[in-house]
Amino acid sequence: QYGTISDSYREIKLLALFLNDFGEDMASLRSEIPTIRILPGDMHTVRTACRHDADHGYVFFNNYQRRWKMDDHPQVKLEGLLDGKASVGFPAFDLKEGMYGFFPYNMKLNDAVLHTALATPLCVLHTKKGDAFVFYGDLDPQIQWEGDARAELCLISRQEALNAWKVHLDQDYLVLSENYVWEENGELVVTGSGKTMIAVYPAVEKGIVDFKECGKRGNFTLYERIYKAQEPEAELVCKEQDKEKAVYELKLAYPGEKNYHDAFAFLTWYGNRMEVFDGEEKINDYFYTGQEALLSLGYFEFPEKLKLVVYPLHPGDPIFLEKQPDAADGCACKIEKLHVETIFR
């Protein structure tokens, strides 16, 4: 909402980056699933499958089931299938509960052939020094090549991959940032708070507008941007509370120059639902999920006063929640805390 990045978006971006550079190859391969039938209630057996031809492929593994505890599997050895040939063996690794993904085997990377890797391909960077192939994962990758040819690899963690953005300026770059990154008129644009740190590979030759180089982390160059701004002032007061609802008044002030793009109000609240009013107009509402409520002040032209109404959630209400809020007073119906964060670009 309001242009923020969800966890689902980050997961989809992982797949989109892979498919953009490697999807044509994967789509041409046939799928093969082991003939053993694994029932949905089986929490003990590792799920595997392959997409492959006679020369190369990808092995998929899954040890995750939502809301179920899966067994850990120490020293698992995956096998990549090939048409009419012996399977390709992977080095052993500990497959923990909750892990899932896929690994390549006999993967052609320009003139080199990557025999096996306990890491997942993300994208290709076409740089002035040649192609760099980005792989991610949290295991020791145990890279194994066929023959003497080698390709340039850039290895990152899965969390870094979730925060990865591929952009093209004078060449391709991989930018690691928790916020949005894109190219605009030949420049790198990065959203973020007053203090924003990014990691870039390879280093940007002409620098990045408003960012200063501040160090190295492996193959990546670190850049930092610091904007000084007077943060919006927020005061939240409970004006009314009864069995039906709790009514809050949120007063906002914006001292100094608004040199920021937006300001987000984050509300920790408990209840069934919450409504936000600007005067008599309802501008947003929320259903309780256990997460903070996010409200863009810039989207609503930086209002100075808002009314927030929280409706109670009672124990036993027919609403599914993975984690129930505290109902010490017989119900959950309150805003516990608020903070405001400015956003720059």
What are these regions (language model features)?
Residues 103, 250-252, 292-300:
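Exposed aromatic-hydrophobic patches
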Residues 256-279, 286:
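Aromatic-lined ligand-binding clefts that engage carbohydrates, nucleic acids, or primary amines
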